Amino acid sequence: MEKTQKIKIGATGWVMIAISIMILFTCGFLTALVGIDYGPHEQIALSLTPGDPVGLFKAHPEPFWHLLTYGVVKLLHCRVEIAAGIVSGLLIVLTYVIAFVTIRNTVPGLEGHEVAGLDLVLHLVSAIYVPFFNKEPFLGQGTPNIWHNPTTIAVRPIALLIFALVASMVIRMRKEEFETNIPVGKAIAAGLLLILSCLAKPSFVQVFYPAIFTLMVIWLIMFKGKNLRNAIQLMLMCLPSLAVMILQFVIAFYSGHSNSGGITIAPFAVAGARTPSIAISMMLLLAFPLLMVILTAIRKELTWGDALAWLMLLWGTIWRLLLAEKGERMYHGNFTWGYMLAVYLVWYTAVRSYLKLYFSEQMTGNKRGVGFVLATAVLVLHLVSGLYYLIYLVVLGHGM
């Protein structure tokens, strides 16, 4: 993505950033105290043996969040529940900051408070809640903002960094007609981040690898092999993290260290277990991104970076619909996490497009028509639903 001249953030922007950080940290901290997934992960954090990294990895092959929590417990001498809330709250704030910086770097002419405000909305929205369709706001629907699962919270800022970095590579490749190599520094950074994402939760690479592969195959066909060199470079960038993911897969499913019975193909069994209609649930989750991709396509503003996000969503949907764990863990939905991360990235591109079309220097107030009104109305529905989801978790005591 090309860097553009940015407007200074200004006092209003900094105030909005500060308010957003306080809101998101508080939400992350409070939901950590009630989230049902936290208990087992907190016990793992307390049981870690950092002095034996090999044994630690064999016992817990995705230890990133647990190591952070362990470190906070030792540093602050606090209860593990407090440490968990601090770590998750800070990770959510980090995701917000990364989104803010990357949006400002890629969309010209945005005021700081505009980006800060819409960035906050991005990190509060959920699927549109329709009680008579599905009584629970998350189960069966999904959300771009997972509050109750610490490892998903841990991998999300890493996933966003990788996406922003690789999307910039993809756009540059196409712009330069595949005549130049991927910058070595960017490739190394992305490769290291991919390894870190596996150590946080391998769900992201499960959608990233097939998406980038699919894009390269599409380009090989469209451009008659011109992108082959860049495709090989991307493959080499992914190999170290792929090795880590394979090792994690073997430990998780076939080493006897877990209670998983392996993987099975179970079409629609898990995805359809808690919803009357998978298709309607997806529409309620993706109404705003779908509308924005249509509006952006009409304006001819779609980028190959946007396409990469939607390809990740495609593969996330495939894994979610088809795969499950055998035995008692079948309905844990562990092949849904990659889908949720892809949903977040599609939402990120949608909010960025919304800012670009209706708030950047390219647009003025008198150019906001029916599309703006409709998109804003749908976004408000998602926001209200997201706020209710937080109330459902924290105030009503449904920690999922």
Where are each of the predicted segments found?
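Hydrophobic/aromatic-rich transmembrane helices and adjacent perimembrane loops
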Residues: 206, 328-356
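Membrane-interface alpha helices of multi-pass inner-membrane proteins
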Residues: 186-202, 208
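Membrane-interfacial loop-to-transmembrane alpha-helix junctions, especially the N-terminal start
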Residues: 10-14, 112-119, 182-186, 229-238, ...
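Transmembrane catalytic cores of multi-pass membrane glycosyltransferases
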Residues: 31-40, 47-50, 61-63, 202-207, ...
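Short hydrophobic/aromatic helix or loop-helix immediately within or flanking a transmembrane segment
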Residues: 40-47, 53-82
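Membrane-interface micro-motifs in multi-pass membrane enzymes
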Residues: 115-170, 278-281, 333-343
